[in-house]
UniProtKB/Swiss-Prot annotation:
The protein, known as: Cysteine protease
GO annotation (BP), single: proteolysis
Family to which this protein belongs: Belongs to the peptidase C1 family.
Entry keyword set: Allergen, Disulfide bond, Glycoprotein, Hydrolase, Protease, Signal, Thiol protease, Zymogen
EC number in record: 3.4.22.-
Database matches in Pfam families: Inhibitor_I29, Peptidase_C1
Subunit structure: Homodimer.
Function: Cysteine protease.
Cell membrane as UniProt keyword: no
């Protein structure tokens, strides 16, 4: 009855006033309406429409393969090259990232691990955020891990300022950090800032999707982490699982600009080729599970609730899919 009422109301109002869901998006006009897109001029709009049609074609051709649903999202009007540059600016230094890693695997003293583990069911994680047109995934991942620790260990629900990390670890502002604002950055550098200075809450230093000069005098309580540790490069699944269970959600760097992950909707993403050169996106692992014999990781992204399943995605576990096991970092309070 409720569905019929909504349908009737939509039929009575002007055409186009009822927004389709992301799965129902079939035209560029629908895409603009759902995601509130406004372009600078006709030339840009034509270019964005071309990219949208390419992504829509890809989604329609791949939907349902291996039981995975793909969907249009906010980034569907970007070219593949633009999207990849948007994530990392093409500026991640893998030599530096590997230098931060532990040299040895964890000592295997953790015994058996549960088949399913999900921090969303054990603590109140903060809302899914949207990094928008700024390549600040590294800041969102680090802040999100710290927020999770405060929820898990102190039962405090706080939303920390990613913008402070973007601005105040910008190496042109403070050369002791290796970050480039919206261009690229490292969650390990963000943790260093949280150790030294701490972060204020989002409401005190709001996010605005651009790099600006740091405001060190912003008022508000500061929240710190006491340390961080990056696991050995290409850690085993068991080491990563144990770390999540013992220390809370972890930051990982992965290949995020491929169309499979970019357009992920529902289902477990499987069998995507990967190499180090494509590492370009930081996200959070909040747990793992198994469904119909397929082992998977639970990923918390920073692309809004329109991506994946309400902002979370599921990627096959057991094959270092998308490089998930390569760069794994946890923090401590």
């Amino acid at each position: 009855m409720k569905f019929l009422l909504v349908a009737a109301l939509c039929a009575l109002v002007a055409i186009g006033s009822c927004k389709p869901t992301r799965e129902e998006i079939k035209t560029f006009e629908q895409f603009k309406k759902v995601f509130g897109k406004v372009y600078r001029n006709a030339e840009e709009e034509a270019r964005r429409e071309h990219h949208f049609k390419e992504q829509l074609k890809w989604v329609e051709e791949h939907n349902g393969i291996d039981g995975v649903e793909y969907a249009i999202n906010e980034y569907s009007d970007m070219s593949e090259q633009e999207f990849s540059f948007h994530l990392s600016g093409g500026g991640l230094n893998f030599t530096y990232m590997k230098m931060e890693a532990a040299k040895e695997p964890l000592i295997n003293t953790y015994g058996s691990l549960p088949q399913n583990f999900d921090w969303r069911q054990k603590a109140r994680l903060t809302r899914i955020r949207q990094q928008g047109s700024c390549g600040s995934c590294w800041a969102f991942a680090a802040a999100g891990v710290a927020e999770s620790l405060y929820s898990i260990q102190k039962q405090q629900s706080i939303e920390l300022s990613e913008q402070e990390l973007v601005d105040c670890t910008y190496n042109r502002y403070d050369s002791s950090y290796q970050c480039n604002g919206c261009g690229s950055g490292y969650s390990t550098e963000a943790f260093k800032y949280m150790i030294r200075t701490g972060l204020v809450e989002e409401e005190n230093y709001p996010y605005n999707m651009r790099t600006q000069w740091c405001n060190p005098d912003v008022e508000g309580q500061r929240y710190h982490v006491s340390g961080y540790q990056q696991l050995r490069y290409q850690s085993s699944d068991e080491d990563v699982m144990y770390t999540i269970q013992q220390h809370g959600p972890v930051v990982i760097y992965m290949h995020g600009s491929n169309n499979y992950f970019r357009n992920l909707g529902n289902g477990v993403l499987r069998g995507v080729a990967y190499n180090d050169a494509y590492t370009d996106h930081a996200v959070i692992l909040v747990g793992w599970g198994t469904v119909q014999g397929v082992d998977y990781w639970i990923i918390r992204n920073s692309w809004g609730t329109g991506w994946g399943n309400g902002g979370y995605g599921y990627v096959e576990r057991g094959h270092n899919s998308l490089g998930i096991n390569n760069f794994v970092t946890y923090a401590t309070l």
